[in-house]
């Protein structure tokens, strides 16, 4: 006996299911991101309550993310500009 053909699948239905799955994943990740952002805000508030300068902490976090050589180059240029303006 010959095998029966597979039922036809509507390509638009498959694409719609895939799109829905992608959207739901993005929404879930956005919710997680908002939760993490709230946690970070709480840590900064704790730091401020303990006497730390939050602006400086943010700058340190930013610097730690960057490559050492890139950071050194920017600092050298900044120093040059400050000297040119008589601020160093």
Swiss-Prot record:
One of its GO terms (molecular function) is DNA binding. This is UPF0335 protein MexAM1_META1p2947. The lineage of its organism: Bacteria, Pseudomonadati, Pseudomonadota, Alphaproteobacteria, Hyphomicrobiales. Belongs to the UPF0335 family. NCBIfam families: PRK13694.1. InterPro entries: GapR-like, GapR-like_DNA-bd. Pfam families: GapR_DNA-bd. It comes from Methylorubrum extorquens (strain ATCC 14718 / DSM 1338 / JCM 2805 / NCIMB 9133 / AM1).
């Amino acid at each position: 006996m010959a095998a029966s053909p597979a039922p036809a699948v509507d390509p638009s239905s498959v694409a719609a299911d895939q799109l829905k799955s992608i959207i739901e994943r993005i929404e879930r990740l956005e919710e997680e991101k908002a939760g993490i952002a709230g946690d970070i805000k709480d840590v900064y508030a704790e730091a401020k309550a303990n006497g730390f300068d939050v602006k400086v902490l943010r700058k340190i976090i930013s610097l730690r993310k960057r490559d050492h050589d890139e950071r050194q180059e920017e600092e050298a240029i900044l120093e040059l500009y400050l000297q040119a303006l008589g601020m160093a």
